[in-house]
Amino acid sequence: MSKKKEKKFQESKISTRSYRSTTMLRHQIRRITTANRLLDELKTSKDIEKFLNNSTWSIKELLQQPLTNTTTKEVSSDVVTKMLKLSGLSDSQDIQNIRKSLNLQMMFINHLYDKSGNNAEKKVNDNNCMFRLLASDHIPQRPLDLDTLMDEINKLEPSEEKGEIGFGIKDLQRDSFVINKK
């Protein structure tokens, strides 16, 4: 940092992190060719710092219950009980709170993956296939022993589909180096 910038930095009495943020933002603003209202408001470093420190939205806004119940599908207590059994956790007496928090998490995840970008309409996705639980998914596999592992290694062959192309000595000799056998 030059002495002139350092003096200006000390006079402004802002933190190093804020200074870096404002400097980066200032450089980005200079690059923008089209003007808008936001650029007119952000002229000084104090304006930029004030803008960066003010939040414009909250996660709590996204976690509100949907306005309409026509397309919503909530997690039932049976699903929560099944998830607790399959996870190996003890059956909790507080299933209603777990169900409520799972519904909120699903609503937030659906908001993150909402492709329409319409935040005003809060709805829960009907596609529950992401959250299905099958007992067959949790069957442990047979343990791998040394003999089985050695057999699988011996059976390996290069796969052209995966881009594993084998080569021989003849292919190596086309390059600029030579292999001498003794």
From Swiss-Prot:
Query: What is the membrane topology listed in the Swiss-Prot or TrEMBL record?
Result: Peripheral membrane protein
**What processes in GO biological process is this protein linked to?**
glutaminyl-tRNAGln biosynthesis via transamidation; mitochondrial translation
The listed locations are: Mitochondrion inner membrane
One Pfam family, short name: GatF
Q: Which UniProt keywords apply?
A: ATP-binding, Ligase, Membrane, Mitochondrion, Mitochondrion inner membrane, Nucleotide-binding, Protein biosynthesis
| Signal peptide (from-to) | none
Q: Which GO terms describe its molecular function?
A: ATP binding; glutaminyl-tRNA synthase (glutamine-hydrolyzing) activity
Q: GO CC terms on record?
A: glutamyl-tRNA(Gln) amidotransferase complex; mitochondrial inner membrane
Q: Which residues cross the membrane?
A: none
In terms of domain of life, where is this protein from? Eukaryota
EC category: ligase
Question: What is the reaction catalyzed?
Answer: L-glutamyl-tRNA(Gln) + L-glutamine + ATP + H2O = L-glutaminyl-tRNA(Gln) + L-glutamate + ADP + phosphate + H(+)
Family per record: Belongs to the GatF family.
Q: How does it assemble?
A: Subunit of the heterotrimeric GatFAB amidotransferase (AdT) complex, composed of A, B and F subunits.
Q: What else is known?
A: This protein may be expected to contain an N-terminal transit peptide but none has been predicted.
Recorded hits in HAMAP family, A to Z, give:
GatF
Query: What does this protein's UniProt record list under function?
Result: Allows the formation of correctly charged Gln-tRNA(Gln) through the transamidation of misacylated Glu-tRNA(Gln) in the mitochondria. The reaction takes place in the presence of glutamine and ATP through an activated gamma-phospho-Glu-tRNA(Gln). Required for proper protein synthesis within the mitochondrion.
**Name the record gives this protein:** Glutamyl-tRNA(Gln) amidotransferase subunit F, mitochondrial
Instruction: Please report the organism this UniProt entry assigns to the protein.
Output: Candida tropicalis (strain ATCC MYA-3404 / T1) (Yeast)
